[in-house]
C-alpha cells in the first residue's frame, strides 16, 4: 500500500460558529493558547510524516499565508534585540511553510467543492483531508493513526 504523503487542509469557510471574532480574523488564525489553530494542524500533519500540504483558502484569508511565510524585518529585529528564542520560533514556522501550497476557492460551496480544488495537487495519490479548525492534540497524532489504518487495510 502506498504511503500517504499529501494533506489537504480546508480553510475556506466563513467561520460563522465563532462570529463576531471571525469577521475580522480567519477562524483558523484564532489562537489556542500561544499559536493559531491552523499551526497546530500543520504541525500534526508534518509530525505524521506528511511532506506535501495544500491549504484551500477563500477571500480574506491572506493571514494564513502570511503566518507561514518569512518576515525578514521581524527576524532582523528579533536578532538585534537578542530575542533568539522568538527568532527560532518565527524561523521554524517559516520552515513549515516551505511544504505548503495554497489554492483559493472562488466560491464557497461546501466540503466537496473545496476538495475539488485539490484535484491537481493530489492527482492519483492517497491523501488526508483535514478541516482547518479541527484541532486534536495527543501523543500519537490523529493524522498518523488514520494514515496507518489506511496503509494497513
Show where each model-derived region lies:
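Residue-level detector of functional hotspots within protein domains
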Residues: 4, 15-21, 39, 86-88, ...
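Short, flexible hinge/linker loops that cap or flank conserved catalytic cores
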Residues: 1-2, 94
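N-terminal glycine-rich phosphate-binding loop and ensuing alpha1 helix
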Residues: 2-79, 141-145
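Conserved beta-loop-beta/alpha segment of the NTase-like Rossmann-fold superfamily
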Residues: 74-77, 87-153
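Flexible coil/linker segments and helix-coil junctions enriched in charged and small residues
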Residues: 82-84
